[in-house]
Amino acid sequence: MNRFRILLCPLLAVALAGSAPVAHAAERKTLRYALEIAETGFDPVEIYDIYSRDIVANIFDAPLRFAYLAAPGTVEPSTADGMPEMSSDYKTFTFHIKQGIYFTDDPAFQGKRRELTAADYVYSYKRIFDPHWNSPIYENFETFGVLGMQSLREAALKSGHFDYDQPVEGLKTLDRYTFQFRLSTPSPRFLQNFADASLMGAVAREVVEKYGEGIMAHPVGTGPFRLVEWHRSSSMVLERNPDYRNDIFHVTPDPSDPGAQEIARELDGKRLPLIDRVEISIIEESQPRWLSFLNGEADFLDVMPRDMADLALPNGKPAPNLVRKHIQVERVPQIDVTVALYNMDNPVIGGYSPQRVALRRAINLGFDTAEIIRTYYKFQAFPAQAISMPGVYGYDPKLRTENGLTSVARAKALLDQYGYVPRHGTRWRDNPDGSPLVIEISTEPDQRSRIWDEIYQKTLDALDIHCRFKVAKFPDQFKAARAGSYMSWSLGESATGPDPSDTLRMGYGPAAGADNLSRFKLAAYDEMYLKQNQIPDGPERLQLLRQMNALLIAYAPMKFIAHRYVIDMAYPWVRYYRHWPFVRADFWRYVDIDQGLKARTLRH
């Protein structure tokens, strides 16, 4: 992976420890930063957006986790007592949970300490299948074919009641600290799903039953932090969980990364988390978020606003004001792809007829990706050729496809060929049946979105296609997209692990309204998706991945636009931070705040 790290101070962040005095015990180490989009809540089975998941990943604990500073994609035990046992046919997985792990105190436990048990993971998994919660991640797990789970869900759909106490053949507690999954089909990469606490964090049944529909506002977990303040869409405060387990850092660092090796040596043997408090603000506009960081109101900048790139990194080098403040800068390829979605159920832009396919492919050809990267991303992105993401299995950096092309002439010829021509004396094209062709674009009310809107409108104007915009905040647009109440909307898709299956679900028919927001449904694609999910990595799987990419490009339910670079910044007193693959918000537990250095720096 192409990665560079700029340390503007001549001393490496980890080396600052030796010169810094120990902070007074009464001083709480606090990490402050801002998110660009508001959270939606904190219930693992109800949330989908990465901003909420970033918070949830620090409150709850999954059995496994991706290892910080290890070779990207390495999985290690978290609450699990060793790695789970996997059968040779990839159908049976047995987890053993460490004893003596406790949930944070909550009135739901009636004053008693509540130990984490295997039953909590079984209950949490079953919640995904409970129709009452309408979980957006249900389809992710339905495809694994856990024996008996689908029957339990279907019974609940008929009766209106989900029976959590009903025994399930494929999901059992073998004893207080052991649970087992049995699948109907092989799943070689099944364990990776249990390395994401925002998906598979354990939730206590008593808490869900106490708070009911209010569970989104009452997260109670076993993770390193707990939520102590929440002002919806404005700010959050999390503090160290006083009941957190004895979590000692030890990892074999990535042998190809000297910086990771140095930090790993410094962290080795330390008890996590290292900080006491995390304060998060929601600042949606780029410039205020950038100025908040420059003014010292935040210690860390999570993804520098790309429209500030010219100011922050002129000619690719840190600006003098950043150098003077000894700010750490890290720029790495983000494991993501940005997409323009088309609702395949929409009567104007959706459908599988040659005319509708031609319309979507023409719009895709009209996108000026170079202009998008220059104007919108400020050169902090590179063109996407397909759904495959850098850093994920199957990504081919040499691949070139129609998706990566820009040709207004070809796009216009395609529209002409399939009957999208002006019929009413204006420049604007009409549908083949003569009705007006208008593309409705969903967007958000912030400055960055307005820049994107101008590019999208310029694309359609060049094709003589009329458009209008539907403006609402991200959570509302997301709800509308899940319900299929939109025509076109753009967003980014990030990978949660090295397996491409989750990303490929963007085109998987049964996931329509969840991962598959375009609502694309094609039997051939669905069959390939299931097959690739059941076989080990190798030539056969790679061929299936290539064929699935080709189908998405041919039918064009979406346009794959770009893979972004992420630029993170931190003041020199933030120690041990690296933007590590698949370890996103989980980094809280690994970073430290050098109170002495911070005090000395702010005095000058």
Language model region names:
Residues 25-31:
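Cleaved targeting-peptide boundary
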Residues 116, 137-160, 164-194, 198, ...:
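Non-catalytic accessory/assembly modules
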Residues 19-25:
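Sec/Tat signal peptide C-region and signal peptidase I cleavage site
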